[in-house]
């Protein structure tokens, strides 16, 4: 059973560095944007990274999903890096350390247009020959660096105009183009004998199309961060629909929305998804890996440890 933690190496996954919206900026949004805006330097504390890994090991977690973004000096495209980005040599050293702790490292590059600011100039070249070549190069390089990982998370969530309402530049692929680019990315991953993994957002809005066109080979991470779980909630119903259609799942929770969410995700999905198709669970925090957020990172791991204990009690009863 997978017990995974999503950790950001890069964090330029939302609005541009100079995004200063002219409207809709109430105080809560200002606070969020102050964290999310892209920066020309790496927001990553190595001491905290090591502490997180140690706590994960102690908690019984066995997978870390590394959201790489601009956090790496890609040899194929060094222009994507920012000040402080890891060298490929540094990344390989860290991956070796992670594996020695009994934790499986999995790469994530989010190619959703909502979350691709990390691509730098290429985020404004979507669906062009240049874009496809860059995506291919990055997937090839990352698969090699991670030594043919079991999974490769491609993101692909929240690609809507509404989600990009505070960005300076918004682009949305729709209909056949979204699927064309999605299949392209999946094919590039599978070319390395690696299994693609994505967020399941598309299902919420277009279930009929999703089940007609989504390959069963692609691992699904539906995500729901609420406290109430019942099938009348569309985001919760997605877990049931994915199960009924035979997809492998790694349900995803979040610690910032409340301590109850992850445990309830484990409880609900353990009861409603076949053990054959329930690959594990993923915890998220959606904050930089930096000292100001240390407490929240460690609290997220503590919550997973409770989820692990709950799961084993349920299975053994």
What are these regions (language model features)?
Residues 1-3:
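Extreme N-terminal starter segment of soluble prokaryotic enzymes
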Residues 62, 145-149, 157-312:
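Catalytic-core regions of glycoside hydrolase
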Residues 6-219:
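Aromatic-lined carbohydrate-binding surfaces of glycoside hydrolases
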Residues 314-317:
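Catalytic domains of carbohydrate-active enzymes that cleave complex glycans
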